Amino acid sequence: VPIGSFQAVKHMLADVKVALEYARSHVYRAANSVARATEGRAVDVSMAKLAACEAANRASRVSLQVHGAIGYTYEQDVHIWMKRAWSLEAAFGNSVFHNQRLASGVIDRTIPAQSFGYISAEA
């Protein structure tokens, strides 16, 4: 029986694909803003880090659930991807740091409006 014949599995994998594509766009934007040394590069990097961590964690959780009990064993490589997702969360500042960085920038109005895709009211 093909795995795609199970609708619940299809939905879980579709959610993972959406999260990965969302993260990919943020990572590309962050890489571009760092390469060009734009003013909002710190914001773009924080948004990319948060999106990538969320996508990696979601993908590893769904993978574990889709594989079932065999996903908990060392016979499959699911445990490796879980550990990589967890280590990504801890590397280069955790989610708390990046959320606080974004929140303080929004509250202090130090983040350029263009970072969120909006045209500044002052422009």
Where are these regions (language model features)?
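Alpha-helical interface subdomain recognition
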Residues: V1-A123
